[in-house]
Amino acid sequence: MGKRLFWTALSGLMVSAAHAAPPAPLPAQQLDWQPWGDQAPNGALCSGRYVEPGYRLSAGDTPRQVRTDSATAAYGDGGATVLAGEVVLRRDDTQLEAPRVRVNAERDRAFAEGPTAVRYPGLLVRGGDASMALDGDAAQVDNAHYVIHEQRVRGDAIELQRLPDGRYRLDDASFTTCEPGNRLWRMVGSDVTLDRAEGFGTATHARLEMGDVPVFYWPWLRFPIDDRRQSGFLWPTLGFSGDGLDYTQPYYLNLAPNYDATLSPRWMSEHGTMLGGEFRYLFGSDQGTIEGAYLASDKGGASDNPNDPDDAFEDESRWYIDYRHAGRFSPRLDYQLAYGAASDGRYFDDFGRDFAEQDTDHLLRLARTTYRGDTWRLDARAQGYQKLDYPLDEDDKPFYRLPSLSADARWRQDSGFYQEWNSNATYFWRDLHGVDSQGRWTDEETGNRRTIPLREAANGSRLHLTPALGWRAEPSWGFLEPRAQLWQSSYQLDYGNRQTDRDENPSLVAPVLSMDSGLIFERDTSLFGSDWRQTLEPRLYYAYVPERDQSDFPDFDTSERAVSWGQLWSPYRFTGADRLGDVNKLSYGASTRFLEDDTGRERLSLSVGQSSYFSDRNIDMNGDPDTLPNKERNYQDWYNATRDRSPVITQLDWRISERWRSRYAWFYDADRSVTEKASAYLQYNDPAGHVLNLGYSWQLEGFEPADDAEDRLGYNREDYDVSFAYQATPSLDLIGRFLYDNTNDRAMEQLAGVQFNDCCSAVQLVWREWIEDNDTANTIDDDYTDRGVFLRFVFKGLGGVGQEADTYFEEAIPGYRATRF
């Protein structure tokens, strides 16, 4: 897609209806506005607040009773009563203030000479001449200024009427949440009706003005005046990019308190007209959403990807659907449904509405129910997902689990003994319709013939059982845990038309034995003028798993685990259940921690550990126990399988102060005297909203570059990552990120943004440039640079323009907490 710009329709119709001059502004104090002065709370964006004063007269003893207070009272013509001199008239919860008030002879209407003030609960109206019914709710104020205190809404009108049904009608009126004296924005309409009981307003010939400049016009508009949901048009989004003009006009439907919908027609000059929508619902403990979009015939668009033709999808329909539901049958039994699908792997690249959506790489399909008891946990699911690669290679198609049934339990005795039952039965399936009987298929990008390995060619069922027995003693000075587990896997496989002599019913039974132990030593010490409690925690771990032939086993969900601190203390070399790696190792290490003596808070932890192997690791992804990786063709895999010791792993986590924290990791191969992997991170996090992250990572043979496929051992991966968020003022935030791949001399991501947030409005402007890799090939020569600009306007109390992307910014900048408008 690329270079997509979301912004408000500031270039909308510059239409302004003829209208009378608005009333002259009033001083802020006459609108119940009180400045904060020295009492402003932290982070206050407004210079003050509206404070509603109490009534000057108490209510009458009976409904509709009228009470008055004035300097003088006299009879006028025709039996009318004339009150003068700071007149206050109250009937029920309505109070009228004026210098002179005339009550007609029928005593059912009062007429006041300006300046006047009419108060209702939560509402103040000031203006010129006014009249009000004494036997009903109707009232009228000329040249009115009004304030709705709780919603921080104010405005003016040539004439304001309170109708008998309690609604308010305003002629040539305005509406804003900006504080008095601030004319940043206001909504203006020739005929405005406010319904406080329902929480919305309507306006004809409405226009949005910024300053005194009209920037958008609506013949008719419905808008909220509080936080309640209302049906009506939402703010449009208008974008310009390499794909041309992109306009979306959403319409919100508040169908019921527990379900609603949004329709979003979208017109794109280079693609055509798309209809999108979303439906949300909540019924008791069940809730869900369904959203989607459909484009009947794509005009072709324009792609920033040099590997894709611009007309790749010309005349084709483009669509997506995403359904999510979560519910609960009982406190222990819940369920979840999800179904996502898109017409093609580039849908979100072309039509993603924000940065996060453009990065969507898969869509989940799931039906699951789970029971969580005190002992047993039962789970039944059917699960898969659509992988959004374009084109999608045959060997990258994911397996579906149709179904997957799990039953797990744990029993624990006071003596420290425990028993576990872990079981899973799953049927794995995927459609390899483009593969011939030899397992070969044609790569759409290169035209080359490729072959799917036999271990990935079968569909079938797997029964996996791992019961375990253990004992754990955990006194205050350490722990000891011997554990024995039985690993059992059996398969029923179907290779379809693939020619093979592999066993279609392979099985495996093997023990997994381990012994974990540790000691905890403590001492009191003093450093840097402070008292500390230091611990020394040596740990010793032994694991044994015999080798078993798994050369006929499939690969449904398995990958080799990366070396890590946690991996030192685990008997498993693979994820999933299709491979059980042989291991005979002893892991040893120690940790020391420094804790504040008075609070017990950990300020520093340092850990060092390593594993020693007593035999080679013969089982790899091929599963053959009789062969090792070829030393000449794949030296690194051979070395990892035959090395006597793991790298020495060092980890440091140092909370330098309340605001500064650092983390460091180092993987050092003492046999070759080389660093295999290293990373360092430094973070500053100020409660005032300032965040700084500095990161560095280096990895030997992190991946294989496209232009240097032969030089595997000498290839390294080096990255720099800098990100920040700076709150310059309570109203102004700056954010940024720079992720740099030093190996290939390219920026992986650049992000720069500014956010302005004041009393009545907010603006987010973010620019992003990133490397797009839309397939799973482990190369870089097909990557390309994409970029986008995100612009969001929020008119507080009225609505906003642009998609919310705060979640993405928080992920890109660890520690950053975006302001929610």
Curated annotation (Swiss-Prot):
Family assignment from sequence similarity: Belongs to the LptD family.
Name of this chain's protein: LPS-assembly protein LptD
Primary role: Together with LptE, is involved in the assembly of lipopolysaccharide (LPS) at the surface of the outer membrane.
Keyword Membrane attributed: yes
Species assigned in the record: Chromohalobacter salexigens (strain ATCC BAA-138 / DSM 3043 / CIP 106854 / NCIMB 13768 / 1H11)
One Pfam family hit: LptD_N
Keywords in alphabetical order: Cell outer membrane, Membrane, Signal
Record's signal peptide: 1-20
InterPro entries: LipoPS_assembly_LptD, LptD, LptD_C, OstA-like_N
SUBUNIT field: Component of the lipopolysaccharide transport and assembly complex. Interacts with LptE and LptA.
Keyword S-adenosyl-L-methionine among UniProt keywords: no
HAMAP family referenced in this protein's UniProt entry, alphabetically: LPS_assembly_LptD (MF_01411)
GO BP term, pick one: Gram-negative-bacterium-type cell outer membrane assembly
